[in-house]
Regions:
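Solvent-exposed loop and edge beta-strand segments that line ligand/cofactor-binding
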Residues: 42-48, 83-100, 140-157, 198-211, ...
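N-terminal secretory signal peptides that target proteins for export/translocation
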Residues: 1-16
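Extended ligand-binding groove/face enriched in aromatic
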Residues: 100, 109-222
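Long, repeat-rich segments with strong aromatic
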Residues: 225-362
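Low-complexity, Ser/Thr/Pro/Gly-enriched N-terminal "stalk/linker" regions
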Residues: 41-91
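Bacterial N-terminal signal peptides
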Residues: 19-32
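Acidic, carboxylate-rich catalytic segments that either coordinate divalent cations
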Residues: 346, 353, 357-383
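Well-ordered alpha-helical scaffold segments within catalytic/enzyme domains
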Residues: 41-46, 56-60, 100-116, 157-173, ...
Length: 383
């Protein structure tokens, strides 16, 4: 680049960072205005302005091939290919799973705001990516012997969330995309049915392999699709893995690169699986200090020290996912349960801490955090 071009690019980045900073600060102001008497409702709303800002972040990344972090096992020299050749539908946004949930986010925003300013561009990108040809290549990739554990279970879960979003949309173009995606979604469902009966122990990490999260979105998909086999599997595995859990060591959280709370993501699964009488009993045994906001390490937002570091910025995602878990767990407890208020207040603190940093100006967080923010702001507590 010439000197003048470099200066122009720097000025553009500064202007973009300033505008996104102002936008996300407005989210903080909305959070501060939230009245505690409405604590069971979403503390922040997703309006058209917010939707546009989130959409622009995803649109910027979904067609961006590099930098790219492939989860690709080479069986030979012929397998060394560019990301767009390996994954013609989901090559952007740094990695496969972020691309998948970036597509989900755009669909969610398009369904909520069909006349969004970015709607035309959203449809153009989705139509270019979610073709039958592209998704056939994606499905064939899953058929490789070396790809058996590919994106298990985090990417699987988001793929089913994408399929669920498409399947529930009465839109002519959306129906074509849903049809194109169905063979890949069917493969992922089979992967769940084949793998989880063999996994004897849950993975309780705060990152991608987390078992509870993988089962959570699979449960949502299965219920929406009327898939009784997958529903039964998730319910049986959830009870097997987590049904007897008590006195969870939540004071050990967070891990330094977590974007899930192993404690809360497990409870968010169990409130789906257990009935309204059973879940409060399980939760009281599982996290007995919740009514007092204890342990404090779980109820206070995590601190992020460097948003240019792809591992440390995970903690912004942790604050967002903690917020959606706490809201939904609280909604699953009886009104008189003393843990509700502590969970709702902490959810607001976590949301406020994270939303201002979804657009940090660095791709380390910007390629994925907006999806977490949209899920938090658009998913109704208790769903």
């Amino acid at each position: 680049l010439g000197q003048n071009e470099a200066i122009t690019m720097k000025q553009t980045r500064r202007a973009y960072s300033l505008s996104t900073f102002v936008f996300f600060m407005s989210l903080l102001i909305l959070a501060a205005m939230h009245h505690p008497s409405h604590a069971s409702e979403p503390s922040l709303s997703l309006n058209r302005e917010h939707a546009s800002a989130f959409a622009r972040l995803a649109l910027k990344g979904l067609s961006r091939e590099y930098p790219n972090k492939p989860e690709h096992v080479l069986a030979g020299a012929a397998d060394l290919k560019a990301p767009v050749a390996l994954h013609p539908a989901f090559y952007g946004s740094y990695d496969w799973h972020s691309s998948v949930h970036g597509h989900w986010m755009l669909l969610r925003l398009l369904r909520l705001f069909p006349d969004l300013n970015e709607a035309g561009e959203i449809r153009r990108v989705l139509d270019a990516h979610l073709t039958a040809e592209n998704l056939a290549v994606e499905a064939a990739y899953f058929g490789r012997k070396e790809s058996k554990p590919f994106e298990r279970p985090y990417g699987w879960a988001w793929l089913l969330k994408l399929a669920q979003e498409l399947n529930g949309w009465d839109d002519a173009q959306g129906k074509v995309w849903a049809k194109n995606l169905r063979p890949l979604a069917d493969i992922v469902v089979v992967r769940y049915l084949e793998f989880f009966p063999k996994q004897n122990y849950p993975i309780r990490t705060g990152v991608h392999p987390n078992t509870a999260f993988g089962l959570t979105f699979a449960h949502d998909f299965a219920r929406a699709a009327g898939d009784s086999r997958l529903t039964a599997l998730v319910q049986e595995r959830a009870r097997f893995y987590f049904g007897a859990d008590a006195l969870v060591p939540a004071a050990w959280e967070p891990g330094g690169a977590d974007f899930f709370s192993p404690t809360l993501i497990e409870a968010d699964l169990m409130r789906r699986v257990l009935g309204p009488d059973e879940f409060p009993v399980w939760f009281a045994r599982f996290l007995p200090g919740a009514a007092k906001g204890e342990p404090k390490a779980l109820f206070q937002p995590a601190t992020v020290t460097d948003r240019t570091d792809p591992q440390l910025v995970h903690l912004d995602g942790l604050n967002l996912s903690r917020a959606w878990c706490m809201r939904s767990i609280a909604a699953a407890l009886p009104l008189q349960n003393p843990a509700r208020a502590a969970l709702e207040a902490s959810a607001d603190r976590h949301a406020t801490a994270a939303l201002a940093h979804v657009a940090s100006g660095d791709y380390a967080g910007e390629h994925w955090l907006a999806s977490f923010a949209v899920y938090l702001l658009s998913d109704r507590p208790g769903n």
